[in-house]
């Protein structure tokens, strides 16, 4: 099972299980200084994963303008592109 950390306005952990299903967790910092996974949205494919990330990030109260939205979408695109490149490397190995 592969796991990737995605840093946007929030921190997420993305797991790809043996059935090629994506599981997206939000990672939150606890009061004692440790991180904990919250939730666990199941995304059956990459487009549904993108939809979930876009929804979570655009619901952030810091996104107020179209420029903010463009920056968020660009950041998501960069993170997902990086993950796709890593997965392609694993597939070739």
Swiss-Prot record:
<protein>
    <recommendedName>
        <fullName>Uncharacterized 10.8 kDa protein in cox-rep intergenic region</fullName>
    </recommendedName>
</protein>
């Amino acid at each position: 099972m592969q796991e990737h950390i995605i840093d946007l306005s929030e921190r997420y952990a993305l797991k790809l299980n043996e059935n090629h299903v994506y599981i997206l967790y939000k990672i939150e910092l606890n009061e004692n200084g440790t991180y904990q996974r919250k939730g666990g949205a199941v995304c059956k494919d990459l487009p549904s994963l993108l939809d979930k990330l876009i929804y979570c990030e655009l619901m952030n109260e810091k996104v107020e303008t179209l420029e903010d939205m463009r920056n968020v979408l660009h950041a998501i695109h960069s993170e997902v592109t990086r993950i796709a490149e890593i997965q392609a490397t694993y597939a070739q190995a």
